[in-house]
Amino acid sequence: MDSQRELAEELRLYQSTLLQDGLKDLLEEKKFIDCTLKAGDKSFPCHRLILSACSPYFREYFLSEIEEEKKKEMALDNVDPAILDLIIKYLYSASIDLNDGNVQDIFALSSRFQIPSVFTVCVSYLQKRLAPGNCLAILRLGLLLDCPRLAISAREFVSDRFVQICKEEDFMQLSPQELISVISNDSLNVEKEEVVFEAVMKWVRTDKENRAKNLSEVFDCIRFRLMAEKYFKDHVEKDDIIKSNPEVQKKIKVLKDAFAGKLPEPSKSAEKGGTGEVNGDVGDEDLLPGYLNDIPRHGMFVKDLILLVNDTAAVAYDPMENECYLTALAEQIPRNHSSIVTQQNQVYVVGGLYVDEENKDQPLQSYFFQLDNVSSEWVGLPPLPSARCLFGLGEVDDKIYVVAGKDLQTEASLDSVLCYDPVAAKWSEVKNLPIKVYGHNVISHNGMIYCLGGKTDDKKCTNRVFIYNPKKGDWKDLAPMKTPRSMFGVAIHKGKIVIAGGVTEDGLSASVEAFDLKTNKWEVMTEFPQERSSISLVSLAGSLYAIGGFAMIQLESKEFAPTEVNDIWKYEDDKKEWAGMLKEIRYASGASCLATRLNLFKLSKL
């Protein structure tokens, strides 16, 4: 049966190719031409049969009672000859040169003359090219040409990145109906409804005179019951534009009653207010006004999670519910990498052990990736100018800092500091660290970067601590750690820098210290239950967690060897002690660990 299908498909492809080549030859040789399309000062010889087969518009025209002379020469008004030429060639060859400069014109013309094959190719192209800079224009095009597939794709793209896109100038130029099509969407990726309200009011103020009259209609798409009541009183009720609009004031009164627990009776004739949404508490027939909608947006399912990134996958762990979620596959992420999460909740992975066997001059590479939270994919960024390992990572104002480490080629200790600017998309060097160091740790807090411990050129552990101010561009010494160490865990927890475990001059350590940023003093904390190196510390939602690392474990041969452990511990602040949570979480093997906020709505439970 399969062989028969394969034969049938082979014959179909052969016949299609033969037919396409034959049609192309007939056009080029101008054989059997029976009509001409005229656009501007250009004429395009064609075949009625081909045009009719590819377009309902032309089929109806050529089958109509129009006199024969008009069918032979068809004048097309307001048509760009160059665009028409591309479309005609596609009909005969199934090949078209689409680019950002011509796709919208080709799309519009194929829509006008009902040529679905060209139309579909344009839609697919535009869907693949969606970006923050063009998504609103593509949304507008999809709505204008009545193409639901394109409009929905663009709207979902905007919804996923609403916080970013609502700040764009294009957003301020949306028509009322275009704005409504965006903000009425359940899948809007906002953690707070306040973001939607502020975006709408900024849109209104961009053209206050004309848009204030549309406010009532747009108002219906904002889900005020999802706001904090205090915010509603301070920012919505007191807004000058809202106070001066009698129609909106009526709705404000209803909302005030709703916050007090008194909802109006659902009405079968109540308008949806452009939202197309039904209140979750009532049936399909009994509707509340759109501005009383209390269905959470998709972005409101965000939760604080521990992200474990290794060379197989990025898995999010919820310590409160003891659940794991697949965030992204990570086969391109090297082992022994470092990772960081920025203040804007952007996850980056830097470095790791990767050997490019095809590159004879520089076989060792330090790659750089960013996690796209929307597509759950890793985006490649410019790699480090020179490969290094055992470095520290910091972040200030969305810029990533790679501090010191070891050169992968020469194994020399480094004091250089690299800075990645995401706007310029390039690396540059900033002020060197005062000493060459590797195996240290770096943490960022309140616009400053802290570099702690590590090993110096003489392979001895240091207890020195430095602070870097990116605005001043200088490093300064802070109070040294009590115990010199390298390969330890670090986290900012309740306003203090906490470090745990690591390697000291005497071997593995279980000691824990905390640095008070206000007093510039170190204090001893409760020891970790086991001596470990490379332990990960994560402060999440007010709790401190310790994950994995390497410990000296006795083997069957009775010898002790460094062995990776993949357990999770929690520090109980009130009792000042460590409590075991999980004996093993396999996703922690070879993983870097981060505290991040992820949307459970987009994750798959493992």
From Swiss-Prot:
Subcellular localization: Cytoplasm; Cytoplasm, Cytoskeleton; Cell projection, Pseudopodium; Cell projection, Ruffle
Annotated positions of the Phosphoserine modification: S3
Keywords: Cell projection, Cytoplasm, Cytoskeleton, Endoplasmic reticulum, Kelch repeat, Membrane, Phosphoprotein, Repeat, Sarcoplasmic reticulum, Ubl conjugation
Keyword Nucleotide-binding: no
Post-translational modification: Ubiquitinated by E3 ubiquitin ligase complex formed by CUL3 and RBX1 and probably targeted for proteasome-independent degradation. Quinone-induced oxidative stress increases its ubiquitination.
Tissue: Primarily expressed in skeletal muscle. Also found in heart and lung.
Domain annotation BACK: ranges: 135-237
One of the record's GO molecular function terms: ubiquitin-like ligase-substrate adaptor activity
Pfam families xref list: BACK (PF07707), BTB (PF00651), Kelch_KLHDC2_KLHL20_DRC7 (PF24681)
Any one GO BP annotation for this protein: skeletal muscle cell differentiation
Keyword flag NAD: no
CDD domains per the UniProt record, alphabetical: BACK_KLHL41_KBTBD10, BTB_POZ_KLHL41_KBTBD10
SMART domains in UniProt: BACK, BTB, Kelch
Quaternary structure and partners: Interacts with NRAP. Part of a complex that contains CUL3, RBX1 and KLHL41. Interacts with LASP1.
This protein's name: Kelch-like protein 41
